[in-house]
Amino acid sequence: MFRGANAVSLDAKGRLAMPSRYRDELDSRCNGQLIVTIDAVDPCLCVYPLDEWEQIEAKLRALPSLREENRRLQRLLIGNAVDLELDGSGRFLVPPRLREYAKLDKKAMLVGQLNKFQLWDEDAWNAVSAADLAAIQQPGAMPDELRDLIL
């Protein structure tokens, strides 16, 4: 399980060092093999351990292919997916096209989302975090299924 928001930096080549607290789990789960693709909803990237991504692919493959919205989602997620591997220093290279999509420069945030990470531009992350907090505090903003969640 991946949790927490981690400030990370991309070097001049677009490499990012995976925080050390996640490296052992990624090494044991998937030998450091990752898939990075766009997030179809938010302006960020999703970084999956290979075993998690294979489950996503199976679900996408099972969708009826004659529905345009299914094909659209498949094109976005699978068409932008890139296989990556952590190097000996625990780094991975974010391809230029994906860096452009998420507007990643030097400062970024790697945010654990249980089964995957989201990779955000730091300023975009700060803005969406503030907006999310403001939205959830509005009366009636909490969905019914979350009202009974014990935190």
UniProtKB/Swiss-Prot annotation:
Gene behind the chain: mraZ
Cited HAMAP family: MraZ
Disulfide bridge positions per record: none
Protein name, entry field: Transcriptional regulator MraZ
Localization terms from the record: Cytoplasm, Nucleoid
Organism encoding this protein: Pseudomonas putida (strain ATCC 47054 / DSM 6125 / CFBP 8728 / NCIMB 11950 / KT2440)
GO cellular component terms given for this protein: cytoplasm; nucleoid
PANTHER family: TRANSCRIPTIONAL REGULATOR MRAZ
Transmembrane segments: none
Superkingdom of the source species: Bacteria
Keyword tags: Cytoplasm, DNA-binding, Repeat, Transcription, Transcription regulation
